[in-house]
């Protein structure tokens, strides 16, 4: 019996992933959720800084994912995300610079809106660095 379902991950810049998979684990705004074939229909927001884990042919692959929505249907899953990167695509120097900029903005203690934006930027930078560090030499 086939235990796969179709997954499509889209960003504004590219089709990040498309194919049949056995399972995914996605970081949503309420925590991580695992999806298998025949999951109940669901629409949920994606965390601003999280991971997408894809199981295909018994092997797991992990990616950085940021913001957007996931729609689970009977015929598959579609993820619309602001950004998605494989670990080898993450520019560590750029992520480190983004982390430092966000930390500086947090120290400046500006408006609440600027603080929230800086905090989100810091979370994204830290998650990108965490994922990259698992697969790249830092």
From Swiss-Prot:
It is a peripheral membrane protein. GO terms for cellular component: plasma membrane; proton-transporting ATP synthase complex. Keywords: ATP synthesis, Cell membrane, CF(1), Hydrogen ion transport, Ion transport, Membrane, Transport. This is ATP synthase epsilon chain. Transmembrane segments: none annotated. GO terms for molecular function: ATP binding; proton-transporting ATP synthase activity, rotational mechanism. NCBIfam families: ATP_synt_epsi (TIGR01216), PRK13446.1 (NF009980). F-type ATPases have 2 components, CF(1) - the catalytic core - and CF(0) - the membrane proton channel. CF(1) has five subunits: alpha(3), beta(3), gamma(1), delta(1), epsilon(1). CF(0) has three main subunits: a, b and c. Produces ATP from ADP in the presence of a proton gradient across the membrane. The keyword ATP-binding does not apply. It comes from the Bacteria. It holds the Pfam family ATP-synt_DE_N. Its main location: membrane. InterPro entries: ATP_F1_dsu/esu_C_sf, ATP_synth_F1_dsu/esu, ATP_synth_F1_dsu/esu_N, ATP_synth_F1_esu_C, ATPsynth_dsu/esu_N. The gene is atpC. The keyword Transport applies. Belongs to the ATPase epsilon chain family. It is found in: Cell membrane.
